[in-house]
Amino acid sequence: MSLPAAAPQPSAAPPIIVRRLGLVPYVPAWARMREFTAARGADTPDELWLLEHPPVYTAGIAGKPEHWPRVDNGIPVLRVDRGGQITYHGPGQLVAYLLLDMRRRGIGVRPLVRQMEQAVINLLADYGVAAEGHTDAPGVLSLIHI
């Protein structure tokens, strides 16, 4: 008596390598991400980089000069090749960069952003911090009085 063949199982997504990089200036981190992406092969594992930056504003593709900081506070503003407008990065702010092969994982940019936002909202809720996302502006907002 032979057993029926097992049904094919969906392949699990490959693991993601997590790198905790500490305080890294924005420009070298950005350059390294571009190098990583350019050198990526079909079997290159995806990575998650966790780091902080010294104070810097980044202006994405939609960043208009009228949205830039209005005072010269000594913090540089850098034009970068990402979506969005102006973002501040600084010490004490955890930045997570996902270096994913999105085709291999079968996900688009907008669904990925929504899933990441929800993951952050859920994590903060676990610590009793109320947070929310907005459909008109990517990101997670939490107003905390320290």
Where are these regions (language model features)?
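Conserved small/polar residues in nucleotide/adenosyl-binding loops
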Residues: I144-I146
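N-terminal lobe of the biotin/lipoate ligase/transferase fold
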Residues: M1-L141
